[in-house]
Amino acid sequence: MNPRQLEQMARQMQKEMMRIQEELANTTVEGTAGSYVTVTMNGHREIKSIKLAPEVVDPDDVETLQDLIVAAIADASKKAQELAEQRLGPLAGGMKLPGF
């Protein structure tokens, strides 16, 4: 493969990577902690919303609510990670990408 072909392939991969990054920014996943907390996050792991079931808001038990929020964020983050790996996997050739 000559240098010109390599450069063309690199540009094509970069263009595809940018397209996938934009797609990840516009794709959301939901993480949950039971039916009490739902966290919506995009493919870049940016939290877009947190929904709480009214019955979970108990001023006498704030710790449980905090634990549920953390669990829902962790669940959403895992799903966003899986989404990114799925979309970027073919470009990465099976390599683990840091930050994804």
UniProtKB/Swiss-Prot annotation:
Entry superkingdom: Bacteria
Entries under Pfam families matching the protein: YbaB_DNA_bd (PF02575)
GO cellular component, one term: cytosol
InterPro entries given in the database record: YbaB-like_sf, YbaB/EbfC
Keyword DNA-binding part of the UniProt annotation: yes
Chief localisation class: cytoplasm
Keyword set includes Cytoplasm: yes
A single MF term (Gene Ontology): DNA binding
NCBIfam families given in the database record: DNA_YbaB_EbfC
Function: Binds to DNA and alters its conformation. May be involved in regulation of gene expression, nucleoid organization and DNA protection.
HAMAP family referenced in this protein's UniProt entry, alphabetically: DNA_YbaB_EbfC
Subunit-level organization: Homodimer.
Family: Belongs to the YbaB/EbfC family.
Protein name (record): Nucleoid-associated protein RoseRS_1534
